[in-house]
Each structure stands twice: as C-alpha cells, then as structure tokens.
Amino acid sequence: MILTKAQYDEIAQCLVSVPPTRQSLRKLKQRFPSQSQATLLSIFSQEYQKHIKRTHAKHHTSEAIESYYQRYLNGVVKNGAAPVLLDLANEVDYAPSLMARLILERFLQEHEETPPSKSIINSMLRDPSQIPDGVLANQVYQCIVNDCCYGPLVDCIKHAIGHEHEVLLRDLLLEKNLSFLDEDQLRAKGYDKTPDFILQVPVAVEGHIIHWIESKASFGDECSHHAYLHDQFWSYWNRFGPGLVIYWYGFIQELDCNRERGILLKACFPTNIVTLCHSIA
C-alpha cells in the first residue's frame, strides 16, 4: 500500500498519545478501513517507537524508577493477581515490556548479591518462569504478552515475518527463473554488508536497471527509510550498482525519489521484469 505523505500524516496524527494495545489497533482499522491490517500495524509500531525514543530518558531517572518500583510493590500487596505492572505502564505511557525490564532490574538489584547482567535479564524476559519471585514473574509475563511493539515476543514475531518475506521473495525469483546469490552465499564470499539477493543477471524494472533486491517486511516511513539509505542502501548501490527495495507493507510515495540515482522502491514484487542478456562481472 503506497500512501502519500498527507495520508500517512493523517494516520500518524491519530496515533498521538494512544497506548500500544490491540484495542487501539482495532480502532485505527475502523478509522482507516481501506488500509491493510499489516500496514496499519507497521505504522502503529513505528510511530510508537518514535514516541518511546523521545520520552525514554524521563523513565530512566533514579527517581522515576524508584517511584515505579514502590508503586509496583504497593499494588501487588493489595492484589498480586491484578495487572499492576501493565496498568502502571499504560498510565505513565511507557511500553509494558520496557516497564517490566525496569522493575525486574530493580528487583534483582535488591535481592541478588551481584548486579544482574544484561544476558540474565534478557533470559528472564524471554522466559519469566526463571524469575525467582512468582508474583513478579506473572506481572512480567502479562506485560510481555500484552505489548504490541516491544519485548521478546514481538522480536520473535518480527524476525519470523522478515524471514517469511525473504522466503517469499526467493520463491518469486525462482519462479521467474532469475539466477541470484543470497545473503549467506555473499557472506561466504567475504562480503560484510549485503542486500538479501544479488541478481547474477541484471533485470530492468520500469526502465531501471536492477542488480540487487532488498526485502523489508515493514512500512517505509521517512525515519526508517532515511536510516536504511544511510546504513544500507547507498552502500549496496556503491558496491553492486542500482537496486530495488520492496517494502511489503507499503511506503510513503514521496520517498521514491531516487530512481534516477539507482534505488527503486516497490510495495510488491514487480510483474514487468525484463531480463537483460549480460551478467554482472
């Protein structure tokens, strides 16, 4: 789904100060029924992550952490089964999984002889049954499963979706009888920064030569696209020549402005591929 900047801004404006909940996403879908669920979820997640980055510091002051911890302790004393941490995260407008991490770190600092390592914290967040306090384990679990944008569950889902779309792209390339090298093959050849697929025989798409294709299982907004241009796409262009980026969940139309310079954007696999007869050196 390709959106104009104005269409994107309208959706983003609706996300100001809404909690990262499934209920919020359902309301967004009702407000924009013509947009796909996947596109809205991607925009929803990206906008919320921008918000968290802007407000992250205020939640990490020693005063804030101590206040949250005492509120957690008071809450579970009254009712340990109630979603105390989840409600607290929503009240102070902080991602539930990140709130769970804060409280878990504070709890372990108080109850363990040595400060907990990052790997231990991550392991406990992935598997809350490892947390030595049953009440806190349940509170952390509630935060993890109810967070739409952060946490180990979301990370696993994003990784799986990304892999799924890479497999889809591979199948489409094979279906078109296009020869290619994938990321693993390129790294075996010594390349450190590579696109998902290098075409061994270049193709033309809408009059533009394509040497490589990158799959992105997300929506291409200004922030993410400019970061990708800087960190990935221009490096690919410099090393391998012009290429194609597929944002499977759409992108802002105005961002497709580098076609003449060698980076083409699409929201699906192109159907009008013309195979060229010479191969990459």
Swiss-Prot record:
Source superkingdom: Eukaryota
Biological processes annotated in GO: erythrocyte differentiation
Localization of this protein: Nucleus; Cytoplasm
Effect on the protein of changing I273T: In CDAN1B; uncertain significance
Predominant cellular place of this UniProt entry's protein: nucleus
The keyword Nucleus appears for this protein: yes
Function in brief: Plays a role in erythroid cell differentiation.
GO CC annotations on file: cytoplasm; nucleus
Impact reported for P20R: In CDAN1B; uncertain significance
Pfam families (UniProt xref): TPD
Noted disease: Anemia, congenital dyserythropoietic, 1B: An autosomal recessive blood disorder characterized by morphological abnormalities of erythroblasts, ineffective erythropoiesis, macrocytic anemia and secondary hemochromatosis. It is occasionally associated with bone abnormalities, especially of the hands and feet (acrodysostosis), nail hypoplasia, and scoliosis.
Keyword Amino-acid biosynthesis belongs to the record: no
Keywords associated with the record: Congenital dyserythropoietic anemia, Cytoplasm, Disease variant, Hereditary hemolytic anemia, Nucleus, Phosphoprotein
The protein's name in its UniProt record: CDAN1-interacting nuclease 1
Positions of disulphide bridges: none
Modified sites of kind Phosphothreonine: T114
Gene that encodes it: CDIN1
